[in-house]
A protein has these predicted regions:
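A short pre-motif secondary-structure segment
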Residues: 119-123
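Structural recognition of an alpha-helix C-terminal capping motif at a helix-to-coil junction
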Residues: 35-42, 46, 55-67
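Acidic, proline/glycine-rich intrinsically disordered inter-domain spacer in sigma factors
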Residues: 2, 75, 81-110
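C-terminal edge and immediately downstream basic/flexible tail or linker adjoining helix-turn-helix-like DNA-binding
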Residues: 6, 152-171
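Short amphipathic alpha-helical boundary/capping segments
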Residues: 9, 104-113, 155
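DNA-recognition helix of helix-turn-helix
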Residues: 66, 137-161
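Short, charged helix-capping/linker segments at alpha-helix termini
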Residues: 1-9, 19-39, 49-55
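Arg/Lys-rich amphipathic alpha helix in sigma70-family domain 2
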Residues: 49-53, 63-84, 97-98
Length: 171
């Protein structure tokens, strides 16, 4: 069965945005993010005739991806191994501040629960409302608010991220 030209165009236009969101959901694991996008797009493709007529098929694809991720978290081992040793997070001389911040963010995202990561990605990366986030995740607005508050509180305690979250200088 060959894919329709419309679906190929959809994938070409949406795959980068889906991959960026998936990277955040997976805590910075590119390989797992690619698997997540591929799985979500295969689900979208199965229903493409119905989905292509929707007002926002990209929103549907994001919803499929988030729900797939939340299902995976219950049964997949991602290779993450907890460590009692806290890594150094101090700035490295030579202009690597952005790399340090990105690495701090990646580690911090892995410390969040899957639901907290999904809320942070939908609310602050994709700039969705609380109601939209709740609809995508299949939960109440109150759950979105509480998960968001808990996640942000955890992220504020990560060295190197406090300045980013509060808008201060990272230098």
């Amino acid at each position: 069965m060959s894919e329709s030209p419309d679906f190929a165009d959809f994938v070409r236009c949406q795959s980068s945005a889906l991959l960026r969101s998936a990277w955040l959901l997976t805590g910075g694991d590119w390989a797992l993010a690619e698997d997540l996008v591929q799985t979500a797009l295969s689900e979208v493709w199965k229903r493409w005739e119905r989905i292509s007529g929707m007002e926002a098929p990209d929103a549907y694809a994001h919803k499929v991806m988030v729900n797939t991720f939340l299902r995976w978290r219950g049964r997949r081992w991602t290779g993450e191994i907890a460590s009692a040793r806290i890594p150094e997070t101090g700035a490295v001389a030579g202009g690597f501040g952005q790399v340090d911040t990105r690495e701090s963010l990646r580690r911090a995202l892995r410390e969040l629960t899957a639901r907290q990561r999904a809320v942070i990605m939908l609310r602050y990366f994709e700039d969705r409302s609380e109601a939209e986030t709740a609809a995508i995740m299949g939960c109440s607005v109150g759950t979105v608010k509480s998960q968001s508050a808990k996640a942000l509180a955890r992220l504020r305690h990560v060295p190197g991220l406090a300045e980013v979250l509060t808008g201060g200088s990272t230098c």
